[in-house]
């Protein structure tokens, strides 16, 4: 799963934030600077599939209804992440 790989890499780089937008390259915030995490775009459909797998059906249902979700996710042995997910358009 690309999302878990990005989360792991963020921790390795001592980053504080992971910025994801569908059909765009992902970005890390490291020591206050926004840096590209990859040169490869994270397709919207792949991002949604990864979020569905990561969060599970109940949280995804809340996201679909409210168009936003604040939650946390623990990546075993790596870190706990606070997540703010929202739709910017539509």
Predicted feature residues:
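N-terminal "pre-motor" subdomain/linker immediately upstream of P-loop NTPase catalytic cores
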Residues: 1-90
């Amino acid at each position: 799963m690309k999302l878990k790989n990005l989360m792991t890499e963020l921790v390795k780089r001592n980053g504080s934030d992971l910025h994801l937008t569908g059909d765009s390259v992902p970005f890390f915030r490291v020591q206050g600077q926004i840096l590209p995490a990859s040169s490869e775009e994270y397709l919207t459909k792949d991002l949604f599939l990864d979020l569905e797998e990561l969060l599970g059906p109940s949280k995804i249902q809340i996201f679909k209804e409210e168009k936003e979700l604040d939650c946390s996710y623990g990546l075993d042995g790596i870190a706990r992440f606070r997540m703010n997910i929202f739709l910017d358009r539509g």
